């Protein structure tokens, strides 16, 4: 990792259908091998499925799912005097969003439905209702931070 300067944040445009920057970030994270149109069809297909099943605004469901997945604290390793401690630290808002998106996609890819649209739709609905493996990942992260609260004075 270069220590010269911090990489500049790239400007991204909101998605054409909903005009939401977070949806664009989500599409970019789903995209494989530069196939943006495939990622768009997956995300929009999942949003349409969510709207038909829940009769709610899909972007609102998406944002509530991300809020339910995003961790508030996580543990980071800190080496002190030959011992490595798992120190709980607060998560920055940008990282919270990035982790939530990453965990949502990973959980959707692990599901057993046939198409990615169905998997993503199911995981979005589960996460919006505080269920699913992405929410479980957040709970596990919070439990780990709570268990290591004794080492919180090692923060940096």
UniProtKB/Swiss-Prot annotation:
GO terms for cellular component: small ribosomal subunit. It comes from the Bacteria. GO terms for biological process: translation. Keywords: Ribonucleoprotein, Ribosomal protein, RNA-binding, rRNA-binding, tRNA-binding. Gene3D superfamilies: Ribosomal protein S7 domain. It holds the Pfam family Ribosomal_S7. Coiled coil: none annotated. InterPro entries: Ribosomal_uS7, Ribosomal_uS7_bac/org-type, Ribosomal_uS7_CS, Ribosomal_uS7_dom, Ribosomal_uS7_dom_sf. GO terms for molecular function: rRNA binding; structural constituent of ribosome; tRNA binding. NCBIfam families: rpsG_bact. One of the primary rRNA binding proteins, it binds directly to 16S rRNA where it nucleates assembly of the head domain of the 30S subunit. Is located at the subunit interface close to the decoding center, probably blocks exit of the E-site tRNA. Part of the 30S ribosomal subunit. Contacts proteins S9 and S11. Belongs to the universal ribosomal protein uS7 family. This is Small ribosomal subunit protein uS7. It comes from Rhizobium meliloti (strain 1021).
């Amino acid at each position: 990792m270069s220590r010269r300067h911090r990489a500049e944040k790239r400007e991204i445009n909101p998605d054409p259908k909903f005009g939401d920057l977070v949806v664009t970030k989500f599409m970019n994270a789903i995209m494989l091998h530069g196939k943006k149109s495939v990622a768009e069809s997956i995300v929009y297909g999942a949003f349409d499925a969510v709207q038909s099943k829940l009769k709610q605004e899909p972007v609102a469901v998406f944002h509530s799912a991300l809020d339910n997945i995003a961790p508030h604290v996580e543990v980071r390793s800190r080496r002190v005097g030959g011992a490595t401690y798992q120190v709980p630290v607060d998560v920055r808002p940008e990282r919270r969003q990035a982790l939530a998106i990453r965990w949502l996609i990973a959980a959707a890819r692990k599901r057993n439905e046939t198409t990615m649209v169905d998997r993503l739709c199911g995981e979005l609905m589960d996460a919006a209702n505080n269920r699913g493996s992405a929410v479980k990942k957040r709970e596990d992260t919070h439990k780990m931070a709570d268990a290591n609260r004794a080492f919180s004075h090692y923060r940096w």
